[in-house]
A protein has these predicted regions:
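Rossmann-fold dinucleotide-binding core
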Residues: 4, 9, 94-148
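Active-site-adjacent beta-strand anchor residues
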Residues: 30, 64, 93, 135-136
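Acidic, glycine-centered active-site loop in nucleotide-sugar glycosyltransferases
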Residues: 42-44, 77, 84-86, 127-130
Length: 148
């Protein structure tokens, strides 16, 4: 299975990261909340100290953050510099279209591939692993994101 960097372990991200770990992925999980990190550890994820540490060496980097400003900030300050050139960036946050496009452009400027992949289904579906993803990006980016 793959190494996955997961950034944002709140109500939705915590369940999503746990399900990736259950599927056998090596999940490096980051959140500002110590409680969220402990829940991730209990679910089989490896808690890390920074977003950059979550991104380092990951085949896929998934963000699930509260707002577009958070996504832009974590990409600019951590993800884009730490990501492997071959990594797929998957933002599952519910953010506005303009921000999603800016984030994708930021990734492309660094030679990285990104998809916008907000979800539907709520906390119960995140915990059950039954979320519906609405993915925007190139066909190649979609193909690379699909296993995650």
């Amino acid at each position: 299975m793959a190494r996955v960097g997961f950034i944002g372990l709140g109500n939705m991200g915590g369940g999503m990261a746990a399900n990736l770990a259950k599927k056998g992925h090596d999940v490096r999980a980051f959140d500002l909340s110590a409680e969220a990190l402990e829940r991730a550890r209990a679910a089989g994820c490896l808690p890390v100290v920074t977003a950059a540490e979550a991104a380092e060496g990951a085949e896929a980097i998934i963000t699930m953050l509260p707002a577009g400003t958070h996504v832009e900030q974590v990409y600019a300050q951590s993800v884009l510099d730490a990501a492997l050139p071959s990594a797929i960036l998957i933002d599952c946050s519910t953010i506005d279209v303009a921000t999603a496009k800016r984030v994708a452009e930021m990734a492309a400027a660094k030679g990285l591939v990104a998809v916008d992949a907000p979800v539907s289904g709520g906390i119960a579906a995140a915990n059950a692993g039954t979320l519906t993803f609405m993915v925007g990006g190139s066909k190649d980016a979609f193909r690379r994101a699909e296993p995650f």
